[in-house]
């Protein structure tokens, strides 16, 4: 590929990976809001499911946004909703357990919070769809670039794309240390008067590309497993 093609792909990839990064952060904040709202409206639910952030749980809370609404739900409808949303994983016993917990819940009946919960779930679903679209575009560029970075165990196309996008031309860096410095991950040195500390007593500088720093940090976690 020509330099122009490579530069174009890098710029496109950078735009897409940064856009995805911002969308994922936005979604994470909304998920925190979901947890907060459930604690108010139906705190017992969290102990009944592996995670609040599941398709089946969102389907339940979209239609019945609180313990009071779930407590008054018809069991047949509740069972069908959970079964469909979980693709058969949750059946009648789960519906009974959830409704019984709702009927004994200490959760508050707050219509405003219930409405906020429904709207937050809707926003998360929209973000899920947007992130999926972005990832399709990222994968298309990664396929064009044919980089070997994703052959490294633990590095998928998301992290690989972000690393490629932020570093660009690897030949610009003559050592791994230079890449770490560019990411703001090189140890800082504290100096005061005659005292100079580095190594075990230092912290990361946290300058440079926060996107690259995020990608390298997360990639390292999986590569080291």
Question: Locations of the language-model features?
Answer:
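A detector of single, family-specific signature residues
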Residues: 1-225
């Amino acid at each position: 590929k020509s330099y122009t093609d490579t530069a174009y792909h890098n710029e496109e990839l950078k735009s897409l990976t940064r856009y995805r990064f911002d969308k994922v952060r936005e979604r994470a904040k909304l998920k925190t809001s979901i947890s907060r709202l459930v604690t108010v409206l139906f705190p017992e639910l969290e102990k009944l499911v592996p995670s609040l952030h599941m398709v089946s749980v969102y389907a339940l809370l979209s239609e019945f946004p609180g313990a009071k609404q779930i407590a008054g739900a018809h069991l047949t409808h509740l069972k069908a909703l959970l079964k469909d949303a979980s693709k058969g994983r949750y059946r009648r016993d789960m519906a009974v357990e959830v409704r019984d917990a709702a009927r004994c819940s200490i959760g508050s009946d707050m219509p405003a919070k219930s409405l906020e919960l429904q709207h937050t779930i809707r926003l998360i679903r929209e973000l899920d769809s947007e992130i999926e679209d972005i990832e399709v575009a990222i994968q298309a560029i990664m396929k064009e670039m044919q980089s070997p970075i994703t052959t490294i165990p633990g590095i998928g196309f998301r992290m690989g794309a972000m690393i490629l996008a932020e570093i660009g031309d690897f030949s610009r860096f003559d050592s791994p240390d230079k890449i770490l410095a560019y990411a703001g991950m090189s140890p800082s040195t504290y100096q005061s008067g005659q005292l100079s500390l580095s190594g075990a007593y230092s912290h990361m500088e946290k300058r440079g590309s926060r996107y690259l720093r995020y990608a390298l940090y997360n990639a390292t976690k999986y590569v080291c497993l």
